Amino acid sequence: AIEEISEGDWRVIFAANVDAAFFLAQAAAPAMKQAGYGRIVTISSGAGLRPSLTGIQAYASAKHALVGLTKQLAWEFGPHGITVNSVAPGFVRSNPASERQWQSYGPEGQKRLVESIHTRRLGTPDDIANATLFFLSEQAGWISGQVLSVDGGRS
């Protein structure tokens, strides 16, 4: 519930998800602009496009903000030959937090989640890496300001 989120928790989540992307892009911008070329890919989330499965307001809000930052940077950097896009993963068991979330669902909740995904499987880190590599490639040279949902068709 929103009443349970401390200001500190809110700020930590925004720092990790929005501030980090902003300051990394800011640091890379001069060299990319001088080169007239660059690729920036942010990792947002399905929670940046719709309500979060976690119910954590700060996480969903930060991921929505990251999508907005991605689109704004694409607008600003485009004239300099720099593309900016975002990969929005669905549920991937890739770290202790996602593993705890998965375990909290229990067998029935896990089954419901997998059945809500059109491909009937959870994503893998490789699924996310492949989408990211696409945005970094020349094949995506005329794509900017876009968010690619990598969620097995759940969105």
What are these regions (language model features)?
Residues 1-2, 9-11, 102, 109, ...:
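Substrate-binding pocket helix/loop in short-chain dehydrogenase/reductase
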Residues 25, 62, 70:
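Active-site helix of classical SDR
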Residues 30, 75-76, 141:
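Alpha-helical segment proximal to the catalytic Tyr-Lys
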Residues 45:
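Residue(s) in the substrate-gating loop at a strand-loop-helix junction
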Residues 49, 88-100:
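Short, flexible catalytic-loop segment of classical short-chain dehydrogenase/reductase
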Residues 50, 133, 144-155:
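Short C-terminal tail/terminal secondary-structure segment
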Residues 78, 83, 143-145:
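Short, small/polar-rich loop/turn modules that mediate ligand/substrate recognition or access, typified
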